[in-house]
Each structure stands twice: as C-alpha cells, then as structure tokens.
A protein has these predicted regions:
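Short aromatic/basic micro-patch
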Residues: 81, 126, 150-151
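Conserved hydrophobic/aromatic beta-strand scaffold that supports enzyme active sites
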Residues: 22, 58, 67, 129-133, ...
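Acidic pyrophosphate-coordinating catalytic loop
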Residues: 46-50, 73, 118-129
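Catalytic cores of DNA base-excision repair glycosylases
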Residues: 1-21, 25-34, 106-108
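N-terminal strand-loop-strand
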Residues: 26, 36-81, 110
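The catalytic Nudix box helix
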Residues: 82-116
Length: 176
C-alpha cells in the first residue's frame, strides 16, 4: 500500500503538476475538494546550518610537516590532520591557531602567511578552514589532546587517511 502511494505521488500526483483527471483517488482527495492540489505538499523551510570557522597549522621543520591524529571517537575519529581548532568568539585567526597549538601540542608557534582557505559542508554544519604556515618558536610537540603526531615528508601525506579538507591542504603542499 505504501509503495503504491509513493508511485502515485511520483507519477500522477506530482507537486508541480498533479494530473487529477486520471487519479484513482479523485473522489477522496481533500486537496482537490478544496482546490489546493497545486499547493501540496507544503514544504517547510530548512533551518540554516551552523557555520564553524577553524584554523590549521602547517608547521614545517627541515623538509617535513607536522600532522596529528584525531582521537578515535567522534567526528573523523582516527583520521590524520594538520593541527588546529575552532575559532572562539572575539578571537583572531592567528590567536586561535596559537592557542590551539599550545593546548594540543604544548608548543609555541609563530603564525606566518595564509596557505589557503578551504570550505566543506558536513551533514549538520558548514566549515571554513583557514590554513597558515607556522614556525616553531619553543618546545617540542607532545600529543596532549591528539592521539598521535608525526613529522612526515609532504610526498608521504597521501599515505595517511585524512578528511577532505586536510587532504586538500596536503595536495596543495605537493604543488608548491
């Protein structure tokens, strides 16, 4: 019965052009009785997706770059990424990146030029990532809020599983 109703809606009673004269439900259709058949179904507006701004650091040492592994649980769990995090209210992008790197890796970085801006839409939110080239000022990276960290050659980045945005950053490094 359900499949038959769905077929009816897909072929005869379409939202933009219902074909009432050939519909087998004409005698029981309330929308037709009220003259509202072209106004059905009523589409509800979708709520706006939240937008999240994040930063990422491309920390270079010699010919290598630093990548970190996300904790195993949660969004993109276990994938590798360039370290960074969410922008907080009232924070500048460089301040955000310095704070996140300090919290995640216990090091201080100097934020340099912007490497790129990357956008991605997830199911429940939209993301804009600002990537910056950074230089270590003090400390040796330790995995405080990440599962692991590695210094890798840019050519090796393709061997690490990454989310789409981080993969775009990795590909851009191979082009430079």
């Amino acid at each position: 019965y359900n499949q038959a109703l769905m077929d009816l809606g897909a072929t005869i009673c379409t939202p933009q052009a219902p074909d009432c004269p050939v519909c087998p439900l004409t005698t029981t259709c309330q929308a037709r009785d009220l003259g509202l058949q072209t106004q059905r179904p009523v589409l509800m507006p979708r709520p706006a997706l939240p937008h999240i701004t994040v930063t990422a650091a491309i920390i270079q040492r010699d010919s290598q770059v630093l990548i970190t592994q996300r904790p195993p649980h949660g969004l993109l769990g276990g994938l590798w990424e360039f370290p960074g995090g969410k922008l907080q209210e009232g924070e500048t992008l460089p301040d955000c990146l310095q704070r996140e790197i300090r919290e995640e890796l216990d090091v201080t970085v100097e934020v340099g030029s912007q490497a790129g801006v990357y956008r991605h839409a997830y199911t429940h939110f939209r993301l804009t990532l600002h990537a910056f080239f950074c230089r270590l000022l003090s400390g040796e990276p330790r995995p405080l809020q990440v599962a692991a960290l590695r210094w890798v050659q840019p050519a090796e980045l393709g061997t690490y599983p990454m989310g789409k945005v981080d993969r775009q950053i990795a590909l851009s490094l191979l082009k430079t």
